[in-house]
Amino acid sequence: MPELKTVGLFLITALAEIAGCYLAYLWLREDKTIWLLVPCALSLVAFVWLLSLHPTAAGRVYAAYGGVYIVMAILWLWVVNGIRPTTWDLVGSAIALLGMAIIMFAPRTT
């Protein structure tokens, strides 16, 4: 099922991006070791590579990916930061996912 593959790839891509950015954040804002930049760089390289695996136009992929990124960021907020999402966080995430689904899976005439 190509839809599940696409969503799964988006989820892994978002995790790579968020993890890489979070590691840089820890170094910059939390005074953690500079060595965190090594896995940070690897994670961000993986993020870019994963984005390149999608078989559709890059602009469409980037637009749709944003919806999945929002959901993953809210999950990160909850799991890593320990902050429970609000109802509005969840509603916004659902709307973002709907947007992703429309962009990626709507019938194409061209």
UniProtKB/Swiss-Prot annotation:
The keyword Mitochondrion does not apply. It is found in: Cell inner membrane. The chain crosses the membrane at residues 7-27, 33-53, 63-83, 87-107. It comes from the Bacteria. The keyword Amino-acid biosynthesis does not apply. Its main location: membrane. One of its GO terms (cellular component) is plasma membrane. Keywords: Cell inner membrane, Cell membrane, Membrane, Transmembrane, Transmembrane helix. It holds the Pfam family UPF0060. It is a multi-pass membrane protein. HAMAP family: UPF0060. Belongs to the UPF0060 family. This is UPF0060 membrane protein Noc_2955. It comes from Nitrosococcus oceani (strain ATCC 19707 / BCRC 17464 / JCM 30415 / NCIMB 11848 / C-107).
